[in-house]
Amino acid sequence: MASPRTVSVAETIDEYLARADWRVNANANQGYSLGGMILNAAGKLIANYWLDEVYAPEAGTAHREGDLHIHDLDVFAGYCAGWSLRMVLEQGFNGVPGKIASAPPKHFSSALGQLVNFLGTLQNEWAGAQAFSSFDTYLAPFVRLDALTYPQVRQAMQEFVFNLNVPSRWGTQTPFTNLTFDWVCPDDLADQHPLIGGEVQPFTYGDLADEMALINRAFIDVLTEGDQDGRAFTFPIPTYNITKDFDWHGPHTDALFAMTAKYGLPYFQNFVNSDLDPHMIRSMCCRLQLDLTELLKRGNGLFGSAEQTGSIGVVTINCARIGFVHSADEDAALARLDELLEIARDSLVAKRATIARHHDGGLFPYTQRYLGTIDNHFSTIGVNGINEYVRNLTRGADDITTEAGMALAARLLDHVRARMVEFQEETGHLFNLEATPAEGTTYRFAKEDIARLPGIRHAGTDDNPYYTNSSQLPVGYTADPFLAMALQEPLQQKYTGGTVLHLYMGEAMPSAEACRELVRRSLSRFRLPYITVTPTFSICPAHGYRSGHHEQCPDCGAACEVWTRVMGYFRPIESFNIGKKGEAQERTYFSTATPGDPGDSSGSGDSTDSGDSVREEAPWHGSPQPVS
């Protein structure tokens, strides 16, 4: 069918050149550049193709009017993917006709080089994050075979990290990459023998603890040093699996938490005190039959995916608008939610069919080579502005921090989960519920609603409006991280896609020990799937790294870049979109001197303490237990 819509060539180019469209800065990873202009212009054509030629009219209308947001419309591809690192290392980077073929690597440096090429190439066949799991476990055999010293491992790792941060992706973007580190060899790999260069090795992965430690230490040291100006490396985003046998006081743990205290780069995946299963990272590619009556977890957080799985596409629901339009009528609100969920389902089914058809037709040659099928990829539905949903539904009487407000939020999330089970049974596809990062969507929804619905409650100002992400707390609510965790614990557990609680700090943590204790206590006392520690820091052109928010260098007065996390990854605040800048201005930072801090008399307990005293030190409005 022919589309009646046209895209003005002159307006498209002129808007970009003049930076007249807020979407020029919607993505903090994409700077103003020729490549950005090409992507922006092409993206408008592709977006209109999706909306007019692929999706049903009601989906196009719902997106254009801001009832929901269909992500990545500017890219004719799936969303994110986790790859089998073991497959790449055992088979090499090859298999696409007419393209250069690399045999399986035999050495550490060549293995890292192939991984850079792999991630950069596959990024061009997907819209979002590309991920590898068990990075330290699978690369350890190469360190053993090459008999590498620490300086040699560090040099190779430095080259790897710098190469991954080159803006080589379309749109002059850096490839969006995630690496998950085991730290301790997983039980299901411990007795397996690596295959290197086509030869089975006499040792097992479980024999390589020393080599894993070298890899982890080298990677951490490279990230801690930063680039030549002291900037943090935005990618790869490291995720660390914290299991019950994690050595909190091991020889390299201080370095891990010193890096976290300074730059806050890692995600910590909670295998200590959550319903996450360490083996799920490798299980999806082996499950021939999936139980569609249960909601599976994708694994590895917002920007990581377990091996051979990921997400075909993401649709986020504008919950704030639902609350306003159906004020004081929860039943009507949930009925409207159902309508939007069904539109989201149908659009994701249409996208999966389209991507699968062109996958089989060769449009994504490297994905076809290394993935084979997209059957194990999820269809992802997210929520945005649940705090504003509560505020509008209750006409300002409650928000997500009150007991009644949390109950409303929990019922909404449970309702979505129940519908997703139905969707799985109806379609035969995997669905998951994600706390979508919604970097630009939070602003787009609020901007649209202010224009259409006078009086709607939102965060920020009318000039810099936004909605609170997913079911997160208002950004200015509290400086107590333990209070925030207690309030978020029951809601964060309801997500089966990515979710994370970012502990935003106004400056670096005072020490590696303080950072370690914060992470240890957080993961042992709360059933949160993922957390980050997110300090704010500044970069002076002359003096480099400076802890805290400094628009001018305290030493020389030069203008500084101020860096913090924008929904998952670190970028300068100046590169944020309008809504995210408004959010950053309103944020209350968590205190670096928290209850149970090592400097506090309560900080001497071990990891088996109950943590009840910590929860009780800051009174709050709701119950920390899950709301049924």
Language model features: what each stretch is:
Residues 2-375, 396, 402-555, 559-562:
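Conserved catalytic cores of very large enzyme subunits
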Residues 177, 181, 375-396, 553-584:
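Hydrophobic/aromatic-rich, well-ordered segments within soluble, folded domains that form packed cores
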